[in-house]
From Swiss-Prot:
Origin organism lineage: Bacteria, Pseudomonadati, Pseudomonadota, Alphaproteobacteria, Acetobacterales
Keywords: Amino-acid biosynthesis, Aromatic amino acid biosynthesis, Hydrolase, Lyase, Multifunctional enzyme, Phenylalanine biosynthesis, Quorum sensing
NCBIfam families linked to this entry: PRK11899.1
GO biological process: L-phenylalanine biosynthetic process; quorum sensing
Domain called ACT: residue spans: 196-273
Domain notes: Consists of three domains: the N-terminal and middle domains form the functional unit, which is homologous to the catalytic PBP domain of the prephenate dehydratase, whereas the C-terminal domain is homologous to the regulatory ACT domain.
EC code(s) of this entry: 3.5.1.97, 4.2.1.51
Matching Pfam families: PDT
InterPro entries according to UniProt: ACT-like_dom_sf, ACT_dom, Chor_mutase/pphenate_deHydtase, Preph_deHydtase
Coiled-coil region: none
Domain called Prephenate dehydratase: residue spans: 6-181
Protein name in the entry: Bifunctional N-acyl-homoserine lactone acylase/prephenate dehydratase
Top-level taxon in the UniProt lineage: Bacteria
Gene Ontology molecular function: any one: prephenate dehydratase activity
Amino acid sequence: MNGERIIAFQGRPGAYSDLACRQARPGWTTLPCQTFAQTIAAVHDGRAELAMLACENSLAGRVPDIHALLPEAGLFIVGEHFQRVEHCLLGIPGSTLADARRIHTHPVAMAQVRGIITELGLDPVVEFDTAGAAEMVREWGRKEDVAVASALAAELNGLEILRRNVEDATHNTTRFYIASRRPATLPPPGPGFMTTLLFRVNNQPGALYKALGGLATAGVNMTRLESYMLEGSFSATQFLMDVEGHPEAPPLARALDELSFFSEQQEILGVYPASPFRRKP
């Protein structure tokens, strides 16, 4: 990579994942990829050093497929980033809000800007990507078509921001995993760490309760727990879990020992510094 540091993301240039890359790793070159699988592959084959992978959103919930892709990729989670989602209404230069007739954006973003759609009486048109919608509005060159995307997408596509912060909720935040081919180099175990792991239990009464009992006993805080059926089977369930702590520190180490006793399989996907965002009120 000739000294150039590259971080890959899923989406078009100007996507919120692109913005997350630029804020989390200032000065790095961002590499857009079409899918999450291609984003992971870019790191795996050496085209990028890191991958920025959206994992959950405060309004839309979990991002699918990440739990299935990461274990098979041979990557490690080495960090996390929280990105505030601030939707902007974008139009071609010289256009105004009064010109707008059709609004283009990703379906999740469309559901988050119902207020502006109603206020302006716009016809919603669903597109594959927020930044992709901005590119299309630029290419069409019509004042009647506007896009909902980031301020970065406006900058990269030469569009005007007709109105900022058109999102209905101000607490719209996306959390990202930052993944690498190598595990994070960390200081000795102590406070301020997060651990992400997968584990599997049988669908039997009390199985999950027993598996997680050690967390409560050890005083370990669990911040995320997602369940997934395995390969279409109803006989076993896989869980993706984020917990506070380092697996070599006594509280979490004890909890993981108990978890391994009651679970069929356990795999740590990464140990990494907790984001400063977690300390915000």
